[in-house]
């Protein structure tokens, strides 16, 4: 069993009967969703909000009952992955392009459970490029303003074409030369730029992290 599968399947044990949960996106959460599909067959009853079309399709294939955030007040738990996790449980997310919906769902949850393998643990955020979701209109001007914060930027592509999010936006991936020492401050500065929709910095949102290591599960 690989480390992503180890963490992902373990996280499924946190889902209890009657819960309303958020389901994240990515290669680690895939294993959680697969395991939850097995538990549904065994009689577990819960409802889920998907954070992407990709997750929605997988959940439907496994007969996991889906609901809309518009129909409920809050979620009991969201299970999601991360691209980087620092010692304060601040995150970089959005490598898969679903950061806006992931943040909306996470902020609607009483708890955010992050799952990852040990390679995602870092001292400081920023080795992994920070995704920033922007609107397409006048995107070059928005990118220029982002660059003024001291980073190198790349417009995200997929199959040699501009990557478009589930919300019909674009993503700028940002590399800061000296890592990100104050994620909250950077997030606030980015959000003040007109044209920026959301950032991949998840600050003070994580309740617990489940890390798959060579020695087993580590809870942070």
Curated annotation (Swiss-Prot):
It is an enzyme of class 5 (isomerase). GO terms for cellular component: cytosol. Its EC number is 5.3.1.6. GO terms for biological process: D-ribose metabolic process; pentose-phosphate shunt, non-oxidative branch. Homodimer. Gene3D superfamilies: 3.30.70.260, 3.40.50.1360. Catalyzes the reversible conversion of ribose-5-phosphate to ribulose 5-phosphate. Belongs to the ribose 5-phosphate isomerase family. The active site is at 102 (proton acceptor). The keyword Membrane does not apply. Pathway: Carbohydrate degradation; pentose phosphate pathway; D-ribose 5-phosphate from D-ribulose 5-phosphate (non-oxidative stage): step 1/1. InterPro entries: NagB/RpiA_transferase-like, Ribose5P_isomerase_typA_subgr, Ribose5P_isomerase_type_A. Pfam families: Rib_5-P_isom_A. Substrate binds at residues 25-28, 80-83, 93-96, 120. One of its GO terms (molecular function) is ribose-5-phosphate isomerase activity. The keyword Isomerase applies. This is Ribose-5-phosphate isomerase A. SUPFAM superfamilies: D-ribose-5-phosphate isomerase (RpiA), lid domain, NagB/RpiA/CoA transferase-like. Keywords: Isomerase. It catalyses: aldehydo-D-ribose 5-phosphate = D-ribulose 5-phosphate.
